[in-house]
Amino acid sequence: MALTYILFQVAVALLAILTYYIHRKLTYFKRRGIPFVAPHLIRGNMEELQKTKNIHEIFQDHYNKFRESKAPFVGFFFFQSPAAFVIDLELAKQILIKDFSNFSNKGIFYNEKDDPISAHLFNLDGAQWRLLRNKLSSTFTSGKMKLMYPTVVSVANEFMTVMHEKVPKNSVLEIRDLVARFTVDVIGTCAFGIQCNSLRDEKAEFLYFGKRSLVDKRHGTLLNGFMRSYPKLARKLGMVRTAPHIQEFYSRIVTETVAVREKEHIKRNDFMDMLIELKNQKEMTLENGDVVRGLTMEEVLAQAFVFFIAGFETSSSTMGFALYELAKNPDIQDKVRAEVEEVIEQHDQNFTYECTKDLKYLNQVLDETLRLYTIVPNLDRMAAKRYVVPGHPNFVIEAGQSVIIPSSAIHHDPSIYPEPFEFRPERFSPEESAGRPSVAWLPFGDGPRNCIGLRFGQMQARIGLALLIRNFKFSTCSKTPNPLVYDPKSFVLGVKDGIYLKVETV
């Protein structure tokens, strides 16, 4: 009886401690006088996530609620994690660029011991991130992009051949799937040196696992929220985010690719070559003069994985959304086609690396697509030390606090981009761009932790779109969704039921 009473008292005490702890968490901003929206006990301000709204819409609603306030940031509960939700562009610039040294970390969950594929450049923090970023920076120079360019064009030419075969048989095509197959074949070739053949093989393995990697999770929304809110505890508990079949597939592919290349002394001037070269360097000298070891096999695996996933989803989605807008705006499409023809003619009918730089209007189309359809909705940062917002002494970001910069919401702010839901490439003319802060456009982030692969992603999308528009005319049809319906279960900007367009040869 006494033991039961003691256990009951212990349980009551633990419950009281837990209740107090959660109460302190959920009143975090109230106690500091920071504007916020009352959170759900468990889901915080993410209550509608995967029910009726995707994360883009949740962030957009929160941003719109406080957009005209004078607050540089407001409170947002990412599940139970209180985050500083940035409203002011000047604060965004301070965090991303001027005071980057205090905000270089992201605070995202990863577990290099139990889930090595998760310890990639996108997730890592501190000295690990800095070291890896320095090691990999040389792999994405313009010179390296020029070496990969012929490979991308070769895949793009095969894409055109497949399209010419498909169009006479069926003029209405689901365009998102087609551009996804193109990007999978490009990245499979450039990252792994493997002919994926997804353009012709309906059941291509790389395409299947590329899509599943973005959908299949080991845990549901609540456990993923727990890992996000308590990353250190989740790591100590040995929690893993990557689904086992995804882990097994990429581990096998990377291990086999490295083994074959090293045994046969194969050189392809691609991303995998660069990773193997870094792996085999016992010592390497960084730009700052530090001498460090090369990459481990686990680091090679993680970087190859994130290169594939990031390049596949962002490039294919951007191309799909661009074609959708060009189909709805035939005058813009005609202008792009005329520019492509003119530029190729200037280069003696050769689609050279220099051509992509001369396609000024096409680049504006891509920039506007990335604004209107921002694939990843936000940038994550975490404060290393207590930070008083310049000019706002009552707004303090505490050490260890998460920061959310809602890039997609910023891209749809009418005070920055008038009529933000209209597709207007002229916004990115040199004249209009000069009138906006650089941090008003953040599809690749900004500052020292911007997207390391942005050059490759842009090159791939430019080549694919230029050749598609040169060879085909895209228009809307009865199956074209208007407006687009987004998938609430997708973290990246995903469309339900695809994008159907009418396609004709030019």
Curated annotation (Swiss-Prot):
It is a peripheral membrane protein. SUPFAM superfamilies: Cytochrome P450. Its main location: endoplasmic reticulum. Its EC number is 1.14.-.-. GO terms for biological process: insecticide metabolic process; lauric acid metabolic process; response to caffeine. One of its GO terms (cellular component) is endoplasmic reticulum membrane. One of its GO terms (molecular function) is iron ion binding. Pfam families: p450. Belongs to the cytochrome P450 family. Involved in the metabolism of insect hormones and in the breakdown of synthetic insecticides. PANTHER family: CYTOCHROME P450, CYTOCHROME P450 6A16, ISOFORM B-RELATED. This is Cytochrome P450 6a8.
